[in-house]
Amino acid sequence: MALRSINKLEVFLKRYSAPTLYYCSNKSAHGATNGIGTDDSNNNYNNNNKNKNGYTGFSWRSVIRFFVPFSLGALASTMVAQREELTPTISARALSGRRREFNFIADVVAGCADSVVYIEIKDTRHFDYFSGQPITASNGSGFVIEQNGLILTNAHVVINKPNTMVQVRLSDGRTFPATIEDVDQTSDLATLRIQVNNLSVMKLGKSSTLRSGEWVVALGSPLALSNTVTAGVISSTQRASQELGLRNRDINYLQTDAAITFGNSGGPLVNLDGEAIGVNSMKVTAGISFAIPIDYVKVFLERAAARRRKGSAYKTGYPVKRYMGITMLTLTPDILFELKSRTQNMPNTLSHGVLVWKVIVGSPAHSGGLQPGDIVTHINKKEIKNSSDVYDALADGKKELDIVILRGVKQMRVTITPEDP
């Protein structure tokens, strides 16, 4: 198209252009003495724009060489400008507006992520071959609730692990050893203390005002991947502990479809105001996870603070004399129904048991062959219907536990030797 335009312009200029103008240095080409003359013959104009008599002129070819690129450049600029106006693209201003309007999750994370911490449980008996440091036996999450280093997490993240030490890594990468201050095994809550000040603190909201369908964000370190964010909605605000087979707890859990997996335990479940409204606690299957309501957590924190003012730590819960190294969940009829509907290879005849949610690396359960997802149905020939039955089996004092499990559709037997605390 551009070449055709040039050809048309060249023909037009040949036909209608005026005679060549030239400037005279001494005299005109045909005797003109006024300094400016005309030359009707283009043949007297050579390729160097210089004639025999020393006159320099501008032919129609010079005009083309100047005018065509200039015209095409102006035309291209005009077309680009018109296209930018007509093309339905999102401008930077419009994009930023849409992002501000719809990326509310990012705003939540920006406001509270600095207070979330990564918790590692280090095995002081085993050391990494290359670094010489204690290996990580398990991990979890937590969040800062006081500027002077007080951290909230789940009890199962930090207790019942002999010969271990607790280490906390902040969002900025700094790492500190931690001491366990308060523990409530019944509610599965604990606090840690690290020796550092001026930390970012997580705001605590109200779980009593939550509604089903409300957006929430789960923060933590699933599978040791720190600073991980997942989002979902509140599926239920009143999931009773009895429905989950937790007979020793009187808690109405928050149920959410936000992804909570290994390592998320102890991390915050926050609302769109960036306030913690729960503590991530457990997962049954994809889309079904539970958190401890923050109103219940506040009661634990008030009691713990009162104990600290009196000079003693707040430690309650059923004693576990021996350590196996698993996190478990009772399979209630409702949970069994959900599992069977989501898992194709689960036998329809299964009516009871305890789901192994997490196995701590290096623990007796890990050494004995238990795996996450196993369902414990019998221990030492006794039926296991809830998690309390497992604690009773540990308290029997037998050296070994003969455990019958269901792994997929296959029934298996494993032998575990629990450790003394």
Swiss-Prot record:
Gene Ontology terms describing biological process: apoptotic process; ectopic germ cell programmed cell death; mitochondrion organization; positive regulation of apoptotic process; proteolysis; spermatogenesis
Region ranges (Serine protease): 138-301
Ranges that cross the membrane: 63-81
Catalytic activity: Cleavage of non-polar aliphatic amino-acids at the P1 position, with a preference for Val, Ile and Met. At the P2 and P3 positions, Arg is selected most strongly with a secondary preference for other hydrophilic residues
Enzyme class: hydrolase
Membrane topology: Single-pass membrane protein
SUPFAM superfamilies documented for this protein: PDZ domain-like, Trypsin-like serine proteases
Enzyme Commission numbers on file: 3.4.21.108
A Pfam family of this chain: Trypsin_2
UniProt keyword list: Apoptosis, Hydrolase, Membrane, Mitochondrion, Protease, Serine protease, Transit peptide, Transmembrane, Transmembrane helix, Zymogen
Subcellular localization(s) per the UniProt record: Mitochondrion intermembrane space; Mitochondrion membrane
Annotated motif IAP-binding, positions: 74-77
Active site as annotated: H156 (charge relay system), D188 (charge relay system), S265 (charge relay system)
GO cellular component: cytosol; mitochondrial intermembrane space; mitochondrial membrane; Nebenkern
Residue ranges of domain PDZ in the record: 324-409
GO MF, one example: serine-type endopeptidase activity
Main subcellular location of this protein, as a coarse class: mitochondrion
InterPro entries reported for this sequence: PDZ, PDZ_6, PDZ_sf, Peptidase_S1_PA, Peptidase_S1C
Annotated CDD domains: cpPDZ_HtrA-like
Family that this chain belongs to: Belongs to the peptidase S1C family.
Quaternary structure, from the entry: Interacts with th/DIAP1 (via BIR 2 domain).
Stated role: Serine protease that shows proteolytic activity against a non-specific substrate beta-casein. Promotes or induces cell death either by direct binding to and inhibition of BIRC proteins (also called inhibitor of apoptosis proteins, IAPs), leading to an increase in caspase activity, or by a BIRC inhibition-independent, caspase-independent and serine protease activity-dependent mechanism. Can antagonize antiapoptotic activity of th/Diap1 by directly inducing the degradation of th/Diap1.
Official protein name in the record: Serine protease HTRA2, mitochondrial
